[in-house]
């Protein structure tokens, strides 16, 4: 496993973003782990988050994009910090773009924030976590309505590796529907592999009991 992946897993634990216990997802699934990206709150945390995304982007995509798009709402600050990190770390200077939930009818009108989307633009979408893919299904029509725009990829922080609308994962379903490449900074398989019986800040994060519960969860909800 690459060093940046290990660092990112510990970073999520330190920020209280990745936790283990008893949770219920929006879809009603009882899950033994939860990823709450709303816990990235400080400037230093957001800066580091952008850097991890930039590393994943650099590892998985050529420089064949000119817009980083973050779906509202969490994707708005995410798209900004990712574009800054790409510039700082790799000298890749691209624009950010996000959508509003409501169309603005005064001042800077329209549904987009940041850069406008024009014919020929190549867009890389950044999202926090995709369980069902709902936000991307909502976002793609907005992007496509702007003109002849090519969406080249989707980058998320954690691939939960769960069933989407069918038996396949949400990311695979999105890839098949829209024809782009997706990637994650880490997968839950990598998270479990790295944290199982490992101490982080003096505490074992995934012990035998939690590991068993995770295994049982994926027997029922894991993507085929």
Swiss-Prot record:
Catalysed reactions, as listed in the record: orotidine 5'-phosphate + diphosphate = orotate + 5-phospho-alpha-D-ribose 1-diphosphate
Pathway the protein contributes to: Pyrimidine metabolism; UMP biosynthesis via de novo pathway; UMP from orotate: step 1/2
Gene3D superfamilies recorded: 3.40.50.2020
Biological-process GO terms, alphabetical: 'de novo' pyrimidine nucleobase biosynthetic process; 'de novo' UMP biosynthetic process; pyrimidine ribonucleoside biosynthetic process
Function: Catalyzes the transfer of a ribosyl phosphate group from 5-phosphoribose 1-diphosphate to orotate, leading to the formation of orotidine monophosphate (OMP).
Quaternary organization: Homodimer.
Descriptive protein name: Orotate phosphoribosyltransferase
Organism field: Clostridium botulinum (strain Alaska E43 / Type E3)
